[in-house]
């Protein structure tokens, strides 16, 4: 099974604190590296992750609030100073495109790599990135500005070859791909060896949904149904539920309600309000509804399995 890792660079909310950095994550999957949100200081957290800047394939911005995007221009500038030459695609809400182009023209005139912004319609659930091994789709969220989440999904892989059976039946290497794709094997005596005897089931495709920032959306459980890991903002406890509704955020209990209803494997909590010196109160509230809840923390590397 190939590595599928979530690096938490920042899990705080809008008000800066000495404890938490602004929202940002790195997703490692299928040999690629994607950044989700890029709050102020994200590139410093990037360095602490021990992932080389050159491995960054694309950046996805959920919405245009500063704690999710103020680090973008600094990061793009650093990539240029480090000698990046390959194109970098930035997926962000479509309203950002004019400002993005102005910022690039003003700050990035000497950069020797191409930056392409892909405008995203945050009101549609759609695949915005696809390659041979994975897809990234948007999930509309309810916030004070256009906002969407992202679901990273592995594509199904071929079954695993049973090496013992290949050796036992003397099947040549040239036939391995055919067998992986479902072919039976006929030996010299004309006996047909069924494919099921020659392979083991493929690993189940894994998935990760990132949902921040959003008001409580009961319907969201259908959009993230069955994902392996769900990151859902948990800015407040239930004592601040009215405040969460006003500012289009969620409580830890509401995040856990989505996780339980969607049947996800694990819930990662994050986007903590600066009012909480100890986020355990958020964790306790979430675990009362969904036991497989975890507090995200800067420096955490979570394996999606």
What are the residue ranges of the model-derived segments?
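Conserved beta-strand hairpin/beta-sheet module of binuclear metal-dependent hydrolase folds
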Residues: 1-49, 85-87, 150-152, 200-211, ...
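Conserved phosphate-binding/catalytic loops in two-lobed NTP-binding clefts
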Residues: 291-299
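Short, surface-exposed connector motifs at secondary-structure boundaries
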Residues: 30, 56, 82-87, 261-268
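Metal-dependent phosphodiesterase/nuclease catalytic metal-binding core
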Residues: 121-269, 278-284, 289, 305
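Hydrophobic packing residues within well-ordered alpha-helices of enzyme cores
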Residues: 46, 72, 100-103, 220, ...
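Active-site metal-binding motif and surrounding structural segment of the metallo-beta-lactamase
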Residues: 40-91, 119-121
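Active-site neighborhood of phospho(di)ester-bond hydrolases with catalytic His/Asp-centered motifs
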Residues: 36-39, 56-64, 93, 208-214, ...
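A glycine-rich helix N-cap at a beta->alpha junction
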Residues: 107-120
């Amino acid at each position: 099974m190939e590595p599928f890792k979530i690096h938490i660079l920042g899990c705080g909310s809008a008000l800066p604190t000495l404890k938490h950095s602004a929202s940002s994550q790195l997703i490692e999957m299928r040999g690629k590296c994607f950044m989700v949100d890029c709050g102020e200081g994200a590139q410093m957290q990037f360095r602490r992750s021990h992932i080389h800047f050159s491995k960054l394939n694309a950046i996805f911005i959920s919405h245009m609030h500063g704690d999710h995007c103020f680090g973008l221009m600094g990061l793009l500038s650093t990539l240029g100073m480090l000698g990046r030459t390959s194109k970098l695609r930035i997926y962000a809400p479509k309203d950002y495109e004019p400002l993005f182009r102005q910022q690039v023209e003003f700050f990035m005139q000497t950069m020797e790599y191409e930056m392409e912004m892909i405008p995203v319609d945050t009101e549609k659930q759609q695949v915005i990135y696809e390659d041979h091994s994975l897809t990234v789709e948007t999930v509309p969220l309810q916030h004070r500005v256009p906002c969407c989440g992202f679901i990273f999904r592995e594509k199904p892989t071929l079954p695993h070859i049973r090496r013992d059976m290949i050796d036992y039946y003397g099947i040549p290497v040239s036939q391995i791909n055919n067998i992986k794709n479902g072919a039976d094997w006929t030996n010299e005596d004309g006996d047909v060896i069924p494919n099921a005897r020659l392979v083991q089931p493929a690993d189940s495709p894994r998935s990760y949904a990132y949902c921040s920032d959003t008001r409580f959306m009961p319907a969201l459980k259908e959009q993230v149904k069955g994902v392996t890991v769900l990151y859902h903002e948990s800015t407040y406890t239930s004592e601040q539920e009215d405040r969460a509704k006003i500012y289009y955020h969620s409580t830890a209990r509401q995040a856990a309600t989505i996780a339980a209803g969607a049947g996800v494997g694990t819930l990662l909590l994050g986007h903590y309000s600066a009012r909480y010196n100890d986020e355990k109160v958020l964790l306790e509230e979430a675990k009362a509804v969904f036991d497989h809840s975890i507090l995200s923390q800067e420096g955490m590397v979570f394996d999606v399995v």
